[in-house]
Amino acid sequence: MKALSLLVRAATCAALSLIAFSAVAADYPTPQEGDWVAGDFRFHTGEVMPDLRLHYTTVGAPSGQPVLILHGTAQSGTAMLSPVFAAELFGQGQPLDASKYYIILPDIIGHGKSAKPSDGLRAKFPHYNYDDMVAAQYRLVSEGLGLRHLRLVLGFSMGGMQTWVWGVKYPDFMDALVPMASLPAEMSSRNWMMRRLITDGIRNDPEWNNGNYMVQPRAAQVNSVFYGIATNGGTLAYQKLAPTREAADKLLNDRLAAPFTADANDFLYQWDASGDYNPAPGLDRIQATVLAINSADDEKNPPETGIMERELKRVKGGRLFLIPGSEDTSGHGTVFFAKFWKQQVQELLQTTPRRAM
């Protein structure tokens, strides 16, 4: 199984170009895209944007039970329409059957078609953090879509961390939380150090010019490949994929030669945003039923640290589903494949009471 850095790129491109085809093939309604503008949006820095554009995709009718699904870093909402995710969840009789659920896939601030530095402000764009991103999602859901309650918030990687933030900041707004490939604790250890290497590498690139570059700094692509290999893919899966030096060289060379279309400012902002993430102090405020899903071979969130078990003790009724590592898993990217956990989510929704909306 290829590492997530390649999978997500391919999945995102496929979702963008073949949304309608995938929907028909997977037997769920054709996704619909929309935009909403949050007026006078205040960032944690105190800066205010008079008009913050938020793009989103929905699957299903607004009359269905609303479900918010949050993508990972450098993705967009349409990444979650990848067949390995959506085709396992949104079809008839599946855990998030779109004939019963109203599925909301936002492009989080700085990503996709939502407002981001490359739209024109470049390095003058406000430096957002995860709290800002979640606050924008809340405004989109409550003001833009007119919803008063969510049945479920589910997120992957960055989206998983922001799922924890949702539970802390808006504890009575949802019935259930499914944070995936994440920990409810501050950035630390390898996870943060690797993120620093991405952002510092871009800032130290000779072409950077404080974000006012004339050509895209090469460091963004090189550091992206480095980070992807170091923090995604799974040990056993990589050994199977590249069992010799020749195979490993080819894999690396292919990734370095692959098209890289990300803007360096966008990329830096996306990774920088996690710096002050830390939901731990507020975990006891969570009211929703929590099912955390991680994989045993997650390079960013290794289970042997015991962090998840320690913090879950403070979440009433919170529990962890840990996917065993194997040649068929892909480290941090394992949970992007819904086949590994869809049954657990179905059982969660069957047993979690619905609150009044």
Positions of PLM-derived features:
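Conserved alpha/beta-hydrolase "acid-adjacent" motif
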Residues: 299-306
